[in-house]
Amino acid sequence: MAAARPALTDSLSFCLAQLTAAAGEGPGGGKDPATNETALGRVLLALRTRHIKAAEGIERFRARGGLRPLVALLRRTAAAGPAPSQAASGSAPPSVASAGSSPGPAPAAESPLTLSAPMRLRKTLDLALSILANCCTEGACRSEVRRIGGILPLVTILQCVRIDSIQNRTARALGNLAMEPESCGDIHSAGAVPFLVESLTACQDSQCLQSIVRALRNLADSPQHRLALAQQGAVRPLAELLATAPDPALTSALVRALLELSRGCSRACAEQLSLGGGLGPLVSLASHPKRAIREAAILILANLCAQGLVRPALGNAGGVEVLLGELRRRRGPSGSSSASQQPLVRAVCLLCREAINRARLRDAGGLELLMGLLQDPGASAWHPRVVAALVGFLYDTGALGKLQALGLVPLLARQLCGEAGEEEEEGVEAASWDFPEERTSGQPEGGSFRSLRLWLISEGYAAGPGDISPDWSPERCPMPEPSESVSPTPGQTSMSTPRTLRKLGRVPAATTEEPWGQEGPALLLLSRFSQAPDPSGALVTGPALCGLLAYVTGAPGPPNPRALRILARLTCNPACLEAFVRSYGAALLRAWLVLGVSPDDWPVPHARPVHRSQHRELGEMLLQNLTVQAESPFGVGALTHLLLSGSPEDRVACALTVPFICRKPTLWRRLLLDQGGLRLLLTALTQPAPHPLFLFFAADSLSCLQGLVSPSASPVPLPDLPLELDSPSPCLYKPLLGPAPAPAPDLHFVLDSGLQLPAQRAASAAASPFFRALLSGSFAEAQMNLVPLRGLSPSAAWPVLHHLHGCRGCGAALGPIPPPGQPLLGSKAEEALEAAGRFLLPALEEELEEAVGRIHLSPQGGPESVGEVFRLGRPRLAAHCARWTLEPGQCPRKRALALTGLVEAAGEEAGPLTEALLAVVMGVES
């Protein structure tokens, strides 16, 4: 049997030649159109089914120049004649269409004279568009089609030929071309979007709709193009189709397109999607079994939250619960990465801007979710956004109580000095829709606003009806707090208008808007908490006070006046007095603001912004506020109760705080002296520290108390040595050491090393009862010329021999004293002191102790020497150490370091240290 003869259309060259010839013929050429279209149809069919679908067939077709005649053919066909009437719309096959030649009312009926040409044009267009769409799946073909002007003919076909199959292939070709940014811009410029939107509303075929939806999705490749699509009405038909999508494939295409169009959601996009009834279907699709559809629907809802106008409707449709549930799932143990949580976090925070959504969010467990975000160090970039969202609950008493119970206050305090999150700025359109921009001053107030204003006035947050405008919202106009006196006593005018607040930037709230930086939301919430009748449990704690003080002292410029008012409000509230005492808050205020030492600066100092004079004035003002509270009848009772009936920790804290906040002698004497507060504090020094800065606080407290006991005390000079060290007295022992001693020694003391030291028997016996009994009594040494001195080194014996022969201030006492920085325990100085006591030479002991003090406890000396001196165990030296530590004018840091050294040196034997410090504080040291 003979092999089948190959057809001419099997040759790509033949097909391209026929295509080129057809593209070069104008409408109404010399040949029979029917014959031409039939032959051309066979060529196009062969190109589509054999040549294009072959391996690398598209590239060969492009390389052989097939795209140019193909585009020319489309251009010729698009201009071949009038578009088929709307009655010919549909995807019915030609046989069905031609069967309707009999007259009748059927919509598809046409005369035979007008049917054949459009049908042939349709077949040509179908095949040519199919080939072009297939070719445009490759980047090189897309670029060439754009270069040869192939976009405009497609737009013309889309406009003129209203047949579903042709619209389908045209939209598919445009969608493929739109994958290139340059082609996408050209398609927009050619005006294709309105025709795609028109086809979207008129078409009924699912495949055609999917192609149009895909084309619109690919055309939304940039913010400008997405906005253009929304402004030309592309979103509403998509939303309307979503509610009636006949099959899952179309639903998937619609959701993907809406996801792309809603990125950076514009007002027009949100309006159209809402008006098209798309919110309800999107909420329903959030539980779709197919993951891609489900996640896309959730992200569309998250994108829509950027527009305030649609958020209330979104909440009514159930979007709040959907977004919270998805965010909770993604943050769970098997959740996804932080990047996938970001749009949901942003959406949930934006939902907090409307009251109706805040209520839904609170009831759905959103507060716990937001608190979890704040407590997560890995979510630190979102913390500023979350805090700003919580401002929406500013006047929701129930929500605030719940947030406080969940630990919001310390998180807010930490937020004041945290790292700035990388959050984009929200546009005006994201503002709360509770107060829309369209509101005018002449618009009558709604009942809800009147109720809000009446509540604010009744609760004391507004003094009168004019204090709050209907256009107020936390995001755009932070409510200024009323100017208030920082002192509860009207007579103290200096405390009512402190210079500190004026210097640090306080301005009258009624005349100038308060600054609203990154710290603004946190401060606004803290201010709201501080206005509670008793805010001590939340705000007068170590973390909260540290956060506020770190912000005030660490701000590069003037701090927000609201932070200063919070501190003033807390110190003026009698309900906070006990909390300030228990938490060492008063001591912290003095250390941080007045002395300039923060917890981070102890014991190693760190560089910080310096505004010491302003911070000092602020600290003194706050302590004065606490003094007013402490010296009131309520404060006296509270302090007395703490000192007598409080826990051991509270009693110590009260004793430590009294010198800072009590100035009345009768009060502090009763608390510290009569009721044992001072001895309690001194005893606690050698116990485990209840606060990281306890020893610093204690040293400062003892110094303040010393100033209260002796108000006119001046720096105490160190006792002078009997003889000036700079000009020592003549040495009386030196003549005995020369080659011709005069007078001649009548005995020698022999040391363990064999060294013999000359001495006078009479002088030695007269200087010490020990040597009087040894050398003049009935001991054998009284008859010996070589008297052994056991257990004595030459360096320790040297000051003893000098002292026995009358030397006072000759410098011999300095010999065994090591220089500062070297240990005294086990040194020659300790041995010399022991020898002076052993030989009953109290004057020598005093001289040696004074020498130790002169060298190791000089005013220029370091605090590390204080503990070394105390370790010698000498009462006079212990008093000297206490006096150096609490000396008026001493550097607070040195004082605290010295006290730390004393406590370490004392160990468990607290008695000597307690007595030494008590004597110095009370001014009764001998």
Curated annotation (Swiss-Prot):
Composition skew (Low complexity), residue ranges: 82-112
The BTB domain, residue ranges: 745-813
Key words of the record: Chromosome, Cytoplasm, Nucleus, Phosphoprotein, Repeat, Ubl conjugation, Ubl conjugation pathway
Chief subcellular location: nucleus
UniProt cross-references to PROSITE patterns, sorted A to Z: BTB (PS50097)
InterPro entries given in the database record: ARM-like, ARM-type_fold, ARM_ARMC5, Armadillo, BTB/POZ_dom, SKP1/BTB/POZ_sf
Residue spans of biased composition, Polar residues class: 484-498
SUPFAM superfamilies: ARM repeat (SSF48371), POZ domain (SSF54695)
Example GO BP: defense response to virus
Chain segments carrying region Disordered: 82-113, 467-498
Associated pathway: Protein modification; protein ubiquitination
Phosphoserine carried by residues: S337
PANTHER family in the cross-refs: ARMADILLO REPEAT-CONTAINING PROTEIN 5, ARMC5 ARMADILLO REPEAT-CONTAINING -RELATED
Entry function: Substrate-recognition component of a BCR (BTB-CUL3-RBX1) E3 ubiquitin ligase complex that terminates RNA polymerase II (Pol II) transcription in the promoter-proximal region of genes. The BCR(ARMC5) complex provides a quality checkpoint during transcription elongation by driving premature transcription termination of transcripts that are unfavorably configured for transcriptional elongation: the BCR(ARMC5) complex acts by mediating ubiquitination of Pol II subunit POLR2A phosphorylated at 'Ser-5' of the C-terminal domain (CTD), leading to POLR2A degradation.
Name of the protein this chain belongs to: Armadillo repeat-containing protein 5
Provenance organism: Rattus norvegicus
Native organism taxonomy: Eukaryota, Metazoa, Chordata, Craniata, Vertebrata
